Amino acid sequence: MTFLILTILATVTPSLYSHVVQRELRVNFEPLAGQRDSWPVARAAMVTFDARSEKAREFSECRMINSMHELSRELMDSPEHTVKRASKEEMDDLVQRCSGSAEGRSWFIWPDTKWCGPGTDAKNESDLGPLEADKCCRTHDHCDYIGAGETKYGLTNKSFFTKLNCKCEAAFDQCLKESIDRAEGSAKSSMEGLHSFYFNTYSPECYEVKCSRKRDAECTNGIAIWKDSYKS
């Protein structure tokens, strides 16, 4: 009897572990031409595959994300370790494989905001969306920056993305966290997703300005250095 049980286990066990289904949200970020804020344009796809297979990149599910609302929901529902950055080339390939089209949609402003994304949907400076985080994004959009290809504080931005002063990123982080603490329900969840999208998924570099003269309150001769994040 013992031999029979062991034989059954030996037969069944490999089949139980032969397939390890993994689900990932792939996100690509690209700059918006002429932008002055630090938000990227996003494209995203949800893929499912067998992680143990030699052909792990043959997807059992391959679905393009069709709106910023959908992207925000997927980001909130996906464990952080399953959200992966994708290069432009990788995303172009996913677009072709998932939709059969050579073009994929890009998404911009976060749901229920007018300032949280590249550019703005606001009609004027006072125009805000219902999400409290929009106030944080508006302030963030008007912060000290170095545009793509520009030089400031003796530092040249050689990337295609606008980079902000690390003080701006720190203030934005704090503002979002305070807004999240005051919120409830779906608004709280949405702002948590927004915070994770910007600081964890996108994770922008920033620059720290050091004044050459300690008594120079306006730091007119400041020199900047790049930082991986405002926390580094």
Swiss-Prot record:
Signal peptide: 1-18
This protein's UniProt keywords: Calcium, Cleavage on pair of basic residues, Disulfide bond, Glycoprotein, Hydrolase, Lipid degradation, Lipid metabolism, Metal-binding, Secreted, Signal, Zymogen
Pfam families, per database record: Phospholip_A2_2
Enzyme Commission number(s) of this protein: 3.1.1.4
Entry protein name: Phospholipase A2 hemilipin
Cystine connections: C116-C137, C136-C175, C143-C168, C166-C206, C211-C219
Active site: H140
